[in-house]
């Protein structure tokens, strides 16, 4: 069995690549492209985000668990893969056709938007070959790391070569869409070396629809939350607000993604432990994984919260500074979302409670729909308010998860909540540091050397504060990672 630590490191490496390159390309694109054209792109991307989940129909999350359970049985592995792949092909074809003919429902006859819309359709077609769930279930994280590095470099070079003036939005869309297609094709041909297609009867597809529908809703909960917010913002007709919301979300998601990805690698192992009846190993991995997760994600989120305006200024220049508060709010939301992910994915999902996840997600999504509708009805178009409705709805979802887990006694949540509180208290010192630094060394919100010095001082003092509190409380996770770092340093020196 492959090392969970090596898997986590490889997956974190993938996430690091997915941080560095989007920051480089995003910063470049935000400065080069016309703000109106980029608003068109983000509006179309919002609509595409609605169709993408239907193309794979929950196969990613369901397949991750299904493949994990049969990966030791070659015959069953081929059968599960074949049935899910065939289903995905059918769903992708149907979804692509609906997408193409749905253009008039969302946009007027704008030639630029129409070109962007059609070119983005390539990303829908590419979902036929979207089989990353197999690689993750088989824990092929080293392959995923190298493939991601290749695709990211290819994308970066292509953007710098072909996107050169403010109206190259269609060219940019084509680069992004073709990169997605190439990415999936590489994974497809890699997996096909070891897994074969087998014949599957039509009757064998019927039992898949209910769990896949549950996974469709569970895995794409953002459609009822942040996606719904963006959809309402698109309906307001103020494209710049869509860009503010999208860029702020992208900054936080990309940076926080390096940590959220690391926790995801344990889902196949958790499913494996439960499948083998190893309850104690399962509980230990959940507790340990959640603690490591919070160890990193909470200080990262609080840090992004206090530096939200500066982050979007550096990322998108002065023309997107209006999204600063949104960036801070998204950072706070990351903590809520982290707990939702731990309780939903690692506890409810791995224990087979997809229906309960679906029900609770729908309840919370309906709450968000009601709140967003009230804002829209009363002509309140400020994007920050729409994000706050999502945060309230996701907090409600978290409460439902906690109540159900305690009722069914699936796992004692005391350990998870204890360290969530501890790391939150440690990270709260960042807020005091922020105000003290800005009182002593105030700067204007323009990109210059004083701004970067101010940010560096805040980040350095915050890191020292966090580490100091970890040392003071003799935090075992901190000393474990410190030991790994010292050991690695010695090996490098030798």
Regions found by a protein language model. Give the residues of each.
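Membrane-interface junctions at transmembrane-helix termini in multi-pass inner-membrane proteins
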Residues: 124-146, 332-363
